[in-house]
Amino acid sequence: MATEHLPAERAQSLLSAPRREEEPQKPNYALRLTLAGHSAAISSVKFSPNGEWLASSAADALIIIWGAYDGNCKKTLYGHSLEISDVAWSSDSSRLVSASDDKTLKVWDMRSGKCLKTLKGHSDFVFCCDFNPPSNLIVSGSFDESVKIWEVKTGKCLKTLSAHSDPISAVNFNCNGSLIVSGSYDGLCRIWDAASGQCLRTLADEGNPPVSFVKFSPNGKYILTATLDNTLKLWDYSRGRCLKTYTGHKNEKYCLFASFSVTGRKWVVSGSEDNMVYIWNLQTKEIVQRLQGHTDVVISAACHPTKNIIASAALENDKTIKVWSSDC
């Protein structure tokens, strides 16, 4: 019966009646591109903040810059002497920093493809790196168990934080650059004041499983951690409380990159040691999609800054990057 034929009171009650909640929509990521160019295991993939490019690093000591939409190889950056574990973009997408087993970081100019600075000071493999939002500072983490803060302009180390008692697995600045989070094989996740270098808080899990990845949420209020017991957790770090736990994937050996997808609905995205990409609903913790196609461990998964696009990369038996897109 059409609403307009009902008595006014009845029609109004129908219009204002609370609706049953709709089923949460799920993503429908499908494979769009497969990018091949590295000759060894890929370690990291990152979209540029302007969304135009995708940077990949690998055990072949190379960085390749790809077109984010067409998958074409734009540039190859040469300079490191040993494998590269991580890359990170400056906020304006004009520069890139890389972390290598040769114990150095390199800052690259995107336009020319040339190395602008080599940052020396770590005494062991440099495993992770990040620019702060103004892109005047770089943070790095190393197997020497320290976190270092560098000045981009001069290439000088400004601070060395005796951060952990085991290798550092991940470092990340928050959205305004005031905080740094570090994760380590010692099982601790630490939040630092970027200006003073003071440790503000330490997060630890029961049993202290090695922390293999850490990242601030886009709004800076939460931290996503991965541990080598097949678990991702979302923390309210100001209270030291774990809010959400995401499981179902496999992660016991490698430091797998995870990411927040916020361009459509809100997902958590991670690689997995069963050769798949896993996508969880951020709120419900439900696995909403698994992306199949890689033939080795998916070490890295990155989300495009403005579109529903995921890039994933895999280890030695695969050596490819796959680009996936979804309607939501």
UniProtKB/Swiss-Prot annotation:
Belongs to the WD repeat WDR5/wds family. The keyword Repeat applies. This is WD repeat-containing protein 5B. May function as a substrate receptor for CUL4-DDB1 ubiquitin E3 ligase complex. It holds the Pfam family Beta-prop_WDR5. A motif (DDB1-binding motif) lies at residues 186-190. SUPFAM superfamilies: WD40 repeat-like. InterPro entries: G-protein_beta_WD-40_rep, WD40/YVTN_repeat-like_dom_sf, WD40_repeat_CS, WD40_repeat_dom_sf, WD40_rpt. The gene is Wdr5b. Residues 1-25 are annotated as: Disordered. It comes from Mus musculus. WD repeats lie at residues 37-76, 79-120, 122-162, 163-202, 206-247, 250-290, 293-328. Gene3D superfamilies: YVTN repeat-like/Quinoprotein amine dehydrogenase (2.130.10.10). Keywords: Repeat, Ubl conjugation pathway, WD repeat. Probable part of a cullin-RING E3 protein ligase complex containing CUL4B-DDB1 and a substrate-recruiting component (DCAF). Interacts with CUL4B and DDB1.
